[in-house]
């Protein structure tokens, strides 16, 4: 991992809950990442999660079936339109969902907000998310980091998922890493195989350091 420097400041209960936005194209692994984060962090932190889908609450259902968190701690939002709009230009539906969840769980440490699948231009409103994690996957080809877009260049953390598929799609992970550094500069990134839990600990370390979390 191209990791951030540790912070000397720690988040306390006096600060509002940390809001972590997770975005990325359809099928990149956003829901899988959210599941793994919840399962790994739920014993140390008070967590709630909000998922976005256009016409259904499928990701909420998947997380519930997987046992990521108790059912009442996962809220599904049906955006009814462009996923990008619901997290950026008009985030009111998600801001309302955050308020509702925090009314139920006022001691929450982290609110995870998973966007619906979108393109490389998707970004979270700063009113909605304190930290943004953008997920792409190797199956899209090694060219993906070079394509740029705010998700790749401006997210707080870029996750390059499905590294195990690199030999199958002819992707060179070293090239992807080099291109990622060129596009992101000093901004951190992690290469993951989420199904095997590879890289999950690095994502958690990033959230804890940048989010000023304390246990």
Swiss-Prot record:
Key word GTP-binding present? yes
Q: Could you tell me which Pfam families the record lists for this protein?
A: cobW (PF02492)
Q: Which UniProt keywords apply?
A: Chaperone, Cytoplasm, GTP-binding, Nickel insertion, Nucleotide-binding
Biological process according to GO: urea catabolic process
Kindly list the GO molecular function terms attached to this UniProt entry.
GTP binding; GTPase activity; nickel cation binding
Q: Which amino acids does the record list as binding GTP?
A: 24-31
Cellular compartment(s): Cytoplasm
> Would you say which domain of life the source belongs to?
Bacteria
Q: Which GO terms describe its cellular component?
A: cytoplasm
This molecule's function is given as: Facilitates the functional incorporation of the urease nickel metallocenter. This process requires GTP hydrolysis, probably effectuated by UreG.
Give the family per the record: Belongs to the SIMIBI class G3E GTPase family. UreG subfamily.
**Oligomeric state and partners?**
Homodimer. UreD, UreF and UreG form a complex that acts as a GTP-hydrolysis-dependent molecular chaperone, activating the urease apoprotein by helping to assemble the nickel containing metallocenter of UreC. The UreE protein probably delivers the nickel.
Q: What is this protein called?
A: Urease accessory protein UreG
**Upper taxonomic classification of the species?**
Bacteria, Pseudomonadati, Pseudomonadota, Betaproteobacteria, Burkholderiales
């Amino acid at each position: 991992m191209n990791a951030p420097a540790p912070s000397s400041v720690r988040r306390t209960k006096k600060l509002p809950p940390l809001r972590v936005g997770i975005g990325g194209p359809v099928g990149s692994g956003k829901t899988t990442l959210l599941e793994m984060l919840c399962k790994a962090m739920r014993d140390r932190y008070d967590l709630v999660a909000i998922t976005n889908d256009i016409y259904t609450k499928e990701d909420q259902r998947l997380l519930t079936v997987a046992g990521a968190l108790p059912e009442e701690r996962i809220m599904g939002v049906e955006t009814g339109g462009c996923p990008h709009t619901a997290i950026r230009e008009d985030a009111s539906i998600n801001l309302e969902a955050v308020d509702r969840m925090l009314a139920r769980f006022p001691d929450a440490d982290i609110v995870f907000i998973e966007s619906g699948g979108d393109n490389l231009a998707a970004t979270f409103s700063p009113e909605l998310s304190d930290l943004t994690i953008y997920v792409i996957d190797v199956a899209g080809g090694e060219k993906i980091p070079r394509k740029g877009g705010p998700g790749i260049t401006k997210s707080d953390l870029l996750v390059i998922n499905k590294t195990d598929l690199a030999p199958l799609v002819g992707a060179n992970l070293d090239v992807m890493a080099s291109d990622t550094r060129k596009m992101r500069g000093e901004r951190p990134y992690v290469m993951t195989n989420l199904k095997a839990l590879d890289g999950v600990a690095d994502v958690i370390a990033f959230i804890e350091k940048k989010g000023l979390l304390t246990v």
